[in-house]
């Protein structure tokens, strides 16, 4: 297929828009909500417990067969994948409207429930979007579709990251209005989803046999992985590799607010410019892995991403300035993206090609599940250690992974 014909394909526009919608809730849960809570006077130890809402992204593999096979009454006439997208998108709009009506200072329990529900709906939406993309495109155009979806996803993250912070800033900290605007975007998205074309496929009905088969598809890749020598040690390296970065990420936005940075400055530097630093770092990380190999690449990027946390200790002792935040964000995002790229490549090489998709999902889910669980306690550690002590602790957290990788380098050929 000619490249010009590919980019004239309307299906790519559909996937791009769905990618935007898919990326929007993630940043609300991971970052934007933390700024609102911090400005409302909520303690950092409480704010980081909202990380429990992220667990849905790690656990979604367990209910993805339901999204594949269960027909939603009434909505399924629009199309099987679309029915799940319509349901999740419309419910996310309602959740965001409900959040806009709440005051976190007086209704924190409601905020917990709504945030967890948003995470569940968002992760389920992701399952349906990925499935729809795979259904709509053949093998020749699948990579273009995936790249388009990722690009849309990044745009969605900017809308609810930089966009939401900037809107809250110019409206005088009117978070209620900000969340209402985001909810309206989801309403418009729901209407758009109805117009999306879906290729209907014959689907297997859920029964005892299919449930047993589903259990086997999850268990067998696990069994295959743990048959290998040093399997548990490898898994520990994967889990610890990004743990320090995950801990830092959980408190970054409240940290900027506490230092005296405005939401507009955070939007422009941490979110908008930070994305550029992340993309460049990811590209460099890929080159490093290609040049020096998996183990050496992981060790190099692992050391780099942990040492860059010293930039936050330095930032903690600087008066709020555009330049200081720019330097810290450049160093941290660049190195973190290098590490993330290296980890993705390493996990990919660990997978048995017979179970590549499932083992990759399970290994990455194990890493994110542990990280998201531990980050719940990040705020308590900040209160106990102070900011400098906490950032030093995140550097130390990288050491187990580095020592394990150095040990494995002499034992395992990956």
UniProtKB/Swiss-Prot annotation:
Protein location: Cell inner membrane
SUPFAM superfamilies assigned: MFS general substrate transporter (SSF103473)
Cysteine disulfide links: none
Entries under Pfam families matching the protein: MFS_1
UniProt entry keywords in alphabetical sequence: Cell inner membrane, Cell membrane, Membrane, Transmembrane, Transmembrane helix, Transport
Bilayer topology: Multi-pass membrane protein
Coiled coil segments of this chain: none
InterPro entries documented for this protein: AmpG_permease/AT-1, MFS, MFS_dom, MFS_trans_sf
Main location: membrane
Keyword presence, Translocase: no
Signal peptide boundaries: none
Sequence intervals crossing the membrane: 15-35, 44-63, 84-104, 109-129, 150-170, 177-197, 230-250, 268-288, 295-315, 324-344, 360-379, 389-409
A GO MF label: transmembrane transporter activity
GO cellular component, one term: plasma membrane
Assigned protein family: Belongs to the major facilitator superfamily.
PANTHER family: MAJOR FACILITATOR SUPERFAMILY DOMAIN-CONTAINING PROTEIN 3, SOLUTE CARRIER FAMILY 33 ACETYL-COA TRANSPORTER -RELATED
Protein name stated in the entry: Putative transporter AmpG 4
Organism: Rickettsia conorii (strain ATCC VR-613 / Malish 7)
């Amino acid at each position: 297929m000619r490249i010009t014909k590919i980019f004239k394909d309307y299906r790519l526009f559909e996937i791009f828009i769905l990618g935007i919608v898919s990326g929007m809730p993630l940043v609300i849960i991971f970052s934007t909500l933390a700024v609102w809570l911090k400005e409302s006077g909520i303690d950092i130890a409480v704010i980081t417990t909202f990380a429990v809402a992220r667990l849905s992204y790690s656990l979604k593999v367990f209910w993805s067969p339901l999204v594949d096979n269960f027909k939603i009454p009434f909505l399924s006439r629009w199309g099987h994948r679309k029915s799940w997208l319509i349901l999740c998108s419309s419910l996310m709009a309602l959740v965001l409207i409900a959040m806009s009506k709440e005051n976190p200072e007086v209704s924190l329990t409601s905020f917990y429930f709504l945030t967890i529900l948003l995470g569940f709906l968002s992760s389920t939406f992701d399952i349906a979007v990925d499935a729809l993309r795979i259904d709509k495109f053949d093998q020749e155009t699948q990579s273009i579709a995936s790249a388009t979806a990722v690009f849309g996803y990044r745009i969605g993250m900017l809308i609810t990251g930089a966009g939401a912070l900037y809107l809250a800033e110019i409206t005088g900290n009117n978070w209620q209005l900000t969340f209402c605007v985001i909810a309206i975007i989801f309403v418009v998205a729901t209407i758009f989803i109805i117009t999306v074309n879906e290729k209907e496929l014959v689907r297997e009905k859920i029964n005892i046999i299919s449930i047993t088969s589903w259990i086997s598809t999850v268990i067998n890749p696990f069994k295959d992985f743990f048959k290998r020598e040093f399997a548990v040690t490898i898994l520990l390296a994967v889990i610890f590799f990004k743990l320090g970065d995950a801990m830092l990420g959980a408190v970054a936005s409240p940290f900027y607010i506490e230092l005296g940075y405005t939401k507009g400055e955070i939007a422009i530097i941490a979110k908008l410019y930070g994305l550029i630093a992340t993309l460049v770092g990811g590209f460099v990380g890929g080159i490093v892995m290609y040049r020096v190999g998996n183990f050496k690449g992981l060790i190099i990027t692992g050391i780099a991403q942990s040492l860059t946390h010293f930039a936050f200790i330095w930032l903690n002792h600087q008066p709020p300035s555009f330049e200081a935040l720019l330097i810290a964000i450049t160093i941290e995002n660049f190195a973190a993206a290098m590490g993330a790229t290296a980890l993705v490549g390493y996990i990919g090489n660990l997978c048995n090609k017979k179970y590549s998709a499932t083992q990759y999902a399970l290994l990455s889910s194990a890493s994110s599940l542990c990280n998201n669980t531990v980050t719940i306690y990040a705020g308590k550690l900040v209160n106990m250690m102070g900011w400098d002590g906490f950032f030093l602790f995140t550097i130390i957290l990288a050491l187990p992974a580095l020592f394990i990788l150095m040990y494995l380098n002499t034992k395992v050929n990956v």
